[in-house]
Amino acid sequence: MALLLKNAHVVDPSVELDGVVDVLIDGDKIAEVGENLAVEGAEVRDLSGKYLVPGLVDMHVHLREPGYEVKEDIESGTRAAAKGGFTGVCSMPNTDPVTDNGTVVEFVKSRAAEVGHCRVYPSGAMTRGLKGEAMSEMGDMVAHGAVAFTDDGRGVQGAGMLRRCMDYGKMFGKVFMSHCQDEDLVGHGQINEGKVSTRLALEGWPAAGEELQIARDIEIAKLTGAKLHIQHISTAHGLEIVRAGKAAGVQVTCEATPHHMFLTENDLDETYNTSLKVNPPLRTDEDAEAIRQGVIDGTVDAIVTDHAPHTPWEKAREFELAPFGMIGLETSLSLVLTELVNTGKMSVSRMVELMAIKPREILGLDQVQVKAGSVADLTVFDASATWTVGEDGYESRAENSGFAGRTLTGRATDVFVGGKQTLADGCIC
């Protein structure tokens, strides 16, 4: 049966649409978009007061399967994604076994098709076992559906190895996503190096440990002609390096997380909240402001979560022993609405670019547009809905949110993936 979505405020800058119209879904496609549509026999849903946009895509997510299902699995991770308004996620390869060959890529895809609540686009490791010693089977992974290459978690430490990966792998047309972390400089760093790390007696993580590799990777991308994407950028100077690389004509893009925009090192205190232990670490107020401005002015290309679930017992350990990472799929859209859109600092149109259009473009995915003939991957949200993070639990298996207890305004209400509803009135279908 066809589904007619009435009176939604549709925003899609790719087709210059920003206004109240009706959208007709028939099967897995959008059949018609227009005013005052009336279709005999169609189910009708009134979306008055809500926004409808192309389906959101998070291009940096840890689903943990295979190997770490105690933290998260594809079913629970994609359920959290649907709750947060996402129609697709790009999964990171630091699984067990590592996603460094076509067999594991095929497993992730087949598992997602079986139990997933959204689309899953697997990324593959640049190097075998994420060890930085030998190139992975890039061609095999692409043949099975890998959309990008990354050694996310520690990055490729050797410049020569990164060059070889880019020189060889660029023939497949995929983007290389760099986790920029110079392990010699970072050492056993726990939080940003500065006054807070000194006060809390925690080993510092210098900003230069990220910035040096951003500069290095941009130079290698320039040398090889490969497409480069800088992951979870967290410093003002790192953003300036990316800005300069773009101006020089290098094929470089970058992403930012809500926690690097809306949390800082000053949120850490003597409670040693391990949910605030992330990689890269929360930086200074000035860094967070620079990242927010980069998101608004176009330097930052995509907003991602770096959703990193861990078990409660892992995060309950001493700060130095607890793993890095926080969950974010269920809060990302709401945080952006609360902090940027509802405050008038950023338009809904710009948000759609950051969370739907550019992620698909960077990953080489087919674009979703709110027009007849396009795949019906759609996100509906209520920009005025108020809720408290964690008050009703999480869809994710994990609870390590750095925003727990915060009241937010704006939340996804409905999600459609290929015309199939995965979230209805805020509930997983």
Predicted regions and their residues:
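His/Asp/Glu-enriched, well-ordered alpha-helical/loop segment
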Residues: R199-K227, G294-D297, D301-I303, A308-F381
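Histidine/acidic residue-rich metal-binding segments in metalloenzymes
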Residues: M135-I303
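Metal-associated gating/positioning segment near the N- to mid-region
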Residues: S48-A112
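N-terminal metal-binding scaffold of metallo-dependent hydrolase/deaminase domains
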Residues: M1-V39
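C-terminal cap of metal-dependent C-N hydrolases
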Residues: E318-L321, V375-C427
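Active-site metal-binding motif and surrounding structural segment of the metallo-beta-lactamase
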Residues: N36-V53
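Alpha-helix-loop-beta-strand connector modules within alpha/beta enzyme cores
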Residues: G102-R119, D167-S178, L335
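Divalent metal-coordination and catalytic microenvironments
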Residues: A8, V23, D28, G49, ...
